[in-house]
């Protein structure tokens, strides 16, 4: 925020059938690993904020407007060849940019705040909730006492409640989504918070606490303990991850090994780095930080996305200094940063315009406020210990009915894609993917009422419900539960 709003408005920007294998590998996108490929059907709008619904479709906001569109994967479960269709818009007075979002345990999506509204500086506290079944966005009551206004961080706790930040101080507000709309909010004092929430991102940890790296009280980091309604120090990141002038900071990503890879903006002068952009690694078990590799060549992440990949690597989007064009993508493998292929608009964009979304196919969807939407296909694969495991399921299902499925690791080993205060695209919830044995057609069946919204749930038995579409293909089929591109081994079902 920095006294006056940072001006980060986007300027003008110059099929193979993959069958489900018996081992349950991901429904992979049909192009070369390690590369970005533009989706076949160009969207009829400038694509901005993406969210993954629990029926496998991706909804995307049109940049700076109230309009939304839906990307539906093709009949083989491939997003590269998916088709676009309009869905209901936000309420007519709400067209946010840089705001808080979440997909909830009941399958609805929710949005709050906005640093801009219809591309005008506003620090709006408006919000809305989306019901996919009714195809409606409905206005919600703003959080009290300034929470929810502007570019807010937000998080869904394992028990399903949604918390949004007050960017002006360390306070926040929380709601039980069952009260939405209109939403009943409870104010949470910023007890123990060392600085205000502005510019900081929140990462959900396996114990249900929140980790943040401070943008003002750097190099301090903090954890929010929900049971105590209190912030406590998580120690020094050792290297600075914020630009002290703009207070911008990079995204952080939970990895399967119980660490959080946090990235930084460099210290800049006249938008140029005067020292390298740093990274640091938080080990949850010890509560300690270790400096990671620096970004090379004057690159950093002064706002921008990152995403976990199925193999545990982290994809990050960098650019030079503060809001300077020239994107370079990297994969972090736990020790080093490795350059990868770049998106089509890399030369004409800074990192902050980009959004990532972890797809159930294992690919990473990218939007940048233009009609160029691309998917990154990682080259690595996952450790079998990270797979969801199905322990209880219906062997026979009837079209039009709802069923419960149980197992372990349904919510994945990470939150998925991250950004920070300006955008949240988490996908730590289970999807159900079904392949018909005769036609090999692939469909996602809507899940809802997940028993947890946690991460790295380990050996705990968790569950979700799934709806069998009335038009589902009948006969013998294979079902997998998938989270962040990692599927379970398939189980056999019969659709009647």
PLM features: what roles do these ranges have?
Residues 11-21:
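Bacterial N-terminal signal peptides
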Residues 137, 289-291, 383-392:
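Proline-enriched interdomain boundary motifs that mark the N-terminal boundary
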Residues 34, 135, 180-183, 229, ...:
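Short coil/turn linkers that define WD40 beta-propeller blade boundaries
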Residues 38-48, 59-60, 67-78, 83-90, ...:
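Immunoglobulin-like IPT/TIG beta-sandwich domains and homologous Ig-like subdomains
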